[in-house]
């Protein structure tokens, strides 16, 4: 199976979109960098699939997944930073689009 090349997180409350592109590997699985370069979506043995910022602080996890799939799961994710929390859909991008 081929790893995702890119995907978008779409925020539930207002449709805000964050685009991620594949950029190397992390712990033997694909790593994805947000287009603005501030956030990574990666897999680790301890946290499974998650998003983290540059200092390694975990900022999001999938809600309805074991987080051990070969690619980030296309499901609802919850972000959390300081006192804010949002729900996002991870939507794989169609390479033909």
Label for each model-derived stretch:
Residues 1-97:
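Interface elements of modular peptide-recognition networks comprising either
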